[in-house]
Amino acid sequence: MKSVEEQLALIKRGAEEVLVESELVEKLKRGQPLRIKAGFDPTAPDLHLGHTVLINKLRQFQDLGHQVIFLIGDFTGMIGDPSGKSATRPPLTREQVLENAETYKQQVFKILDPAKTEVAFNSTWMDKLTPADFIRLASQYTVARMLERDDFDKRYTTNQPIAIHEFLYPLVQGYDSVALKADVELGGTDQKFNLLMGRELQRSYGQEAQNIVTMPLLEGLDGVKKMSKSLGNYVGIQEAPGVMYSKLVSIPDTLMWRYFELLSFRSMEEIEQFRADVANGANPRDIKIKLAEEIVARFHGEEAAANAHRAAGNRMKEGELPEDLPEIEVAAAEDLPIAAVLNRAGLVKNSAQARDLLNSGAVKVDGAVVDKDFMFVLGATHVCQAGKKSFGRVTLKAE
């Protein structure tokens, strides 16, 4: 096991906050594996790179010799996390949650070591609680304290409804830490209130309080808003290798260091060397290629990553693209779906043709076939091909 100082440095890499650091240091000094918990509500069937920020941190804890608990919130998923929400989320059925949970397990083991991962479902203990147990749990916190949360406070002051079951969510998440006897809990910055609840409940139930590591919310491909499938600025971990590669090599230069810190397993020394190389004149795209290859290999294997790189770098092969590829600039105020970009760039006659080509798999971006969900990020440049004869190197510029 690494020294306490070395462990702490890796734990703090990319982290927003460690609470309470001095307590965590004392736990590390004991030289015993700690129980590290991170919970995920399976509210959707697929994960994107934003979700993997926490999973990557779990892997780092595994590599340090600690016991990782991947908690699937099949019980809390039916409540719906109110964190950051302006309205009550519709609850999912048990069947929906379990179906999504199964795909989560398949996806996370692309990062985590299955032999060193304890998979838990919070319904295991929550389904056993009696009404009296729930009343005892609810008695640990007051409504006034709940309303200290920004999201609840905003809804309360604007007369937006807050359902009673939403107050239960932080309590249930906190009780998960009691049930699992967690030493450390990981979560996004938007989860801090819930994570602190775990500390308080553990004390109430006679346990040593867990420490908290909060991780930032990963920016999407636009470099501004958090990564979200609904915003179209995401990289899905089950996307085709070529699409994943194409998206990653096209991120803004300013975003690549953030992605290296939160998504890459390269050492900080190696990343700092990349920074120095760029400062000394290296092409940022060459560095982004290293990032893209690493991430594609993680989810699809080394061969798929090599093939994606080869396809993107071999556009002139067999006359696929003309040597005098036209440079096209499209003005926009925000990210655009690929169909709109093709239309504005003049690579298709109209929106209907763009849709037809996308539906038939006849649109390529940087050598990879894309579908209608591909979002062209503001500031990005891609080589686009629509059909067999329409090509262009398209840049989406801010208007």
Curated annotation (Swiss-Prot):
One of its GO terms (cellular component) is cytosol. GO terms for biological process: tyrosyl-tRNA aminoacylation. It is an enzyme of class 6 (ligase). A motif ('HIGH' region) lies at residues 42-51. Signal peptide: none annotated. GO terms for molecular function: ATP binding; RNA binding; tyrosine-tRNA ligase activity. Keywords: Aminoacyl-tRNA synthetase, ATP-binding, Cytoplasm, Ligase, Nucleotide-binding, Protein biosynthesis, RNA-binding. It catalyses: tRNA(Tyr) + L-tyrosine + ATP = L-tyrosyl-tRNA(Tyr) + AMP + diphosphate + H(+). It comes from the Bacteria. A motif ('KMSKS' region) lies at residues 226-230. Residues 336-396 form the S4 RNA-binding domain. Its EC number is 6.1.1.1. ATP binds at residue 229. The keyword Protein biosynthesis applies. Its main location: cytoplasm. It is found in: Cytoplasm. Belongs to the class-I aminoacyl-tRNA synthetase family. TyrS type 2 subfamily. Catalyzes the attachment of tyrosine to tRNA(Tyr) in a two-step reaction: tyrosine is first activated by ATP to form Tyr-AMP and then transferred to the acceptor end of tRNA(Tyr). Homodimer. This is Tyrosine--tRNA ligase. It comes from Pseudomonas putida (strain ATCC 47054 / DSM 6125 / CFBP 8728 / NCIMB 11950 / KT2440).
